[in-house]
Amino acid sequence: LYAPGYFEMSIRKGESIVFAASTSASKTSGLKKLFQEEVDERSPRDNFFHCLVNAAHQFHVEDKNGDAYILAGYPWFKPRARDTFISLPGLTLSIEEYEFFEAAMKTAEKGLREFMEQKPLTVKLYEIEHPDVPLWAIWAIQQYAKEAGVDKCLEKYGQLVWDILHFIKEQQHPNLTLEDNGLVKTDGKQQAVTWMNSTANGRPIVPRSGFVV
């Protein structure tokens, strides 16, 4: 039941109080240290840029294995491959956080390679089989090259880009074919294949097939 109340205590000028409320007892000797650790992890919201940084951090997640992901959205979306590559530059490079870009891309690269090698996925990156995902991956890497430099990008992701292009060129993707005109084609009649992925009765509402742009 809702039970309003208040707490009173005497403090000296300049003294700080750390208050903790929970259903179980806390070790009070460690509360101040815990509070400071939480403060240090948070972004200050004292200007517009810091507010954007704080908002971006809400989509940065890391699991117990140390794999880094971008959450597709709240309240129920999981890390999705397409959403990851589309949003990754804006949620990392734009706020000068190259390390998280590289961490999330490391996780994504593992998933991409497992998909291309037809191995079971060991990362929690969903919908990686969609035909535009490898193209968005290359686009995200291009954004990294613009910010971090071509040489560094080539060193870190050159082989991945080459392997993705080879995968597509050799017609190994289950729903992305390289045509004689040099464009890539996909079939979206049975399932949604792009970001316009709303469905009704298990079928795409907007069946996007052909040379999707």
Say what each PLM segment does:
Residues L88-L91, I141, V161:
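Hydrophobic core/packing positions within alpha-helical solenoid repeats
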Residues L1-Y6, S10-V18, F115-W136, Q142-Q159, ...:
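The feature captures the catalytic groove of carbohydrate-active enzymes
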Residues L1-K78, D151-K152, W162-H173:
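Acidic/polar, glycine-enriched structural segments that form the non-catalytic walls/loops
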Residues D83-I86, V133-A137:
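Catalytic-loop motifs flanking and including active-site residues across diverse enzymes
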Residues P75-A108:
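Alpha-helical support elements that line or immediately flank enzyme active sites
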Residues E41-H60, E96-A108, D180-Q191:
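An acidic intrinsically disordered interaction segment
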Residues N54-A68, M105-E117, Q190-R203:
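Active-site-adjacent bridging/hinge elements
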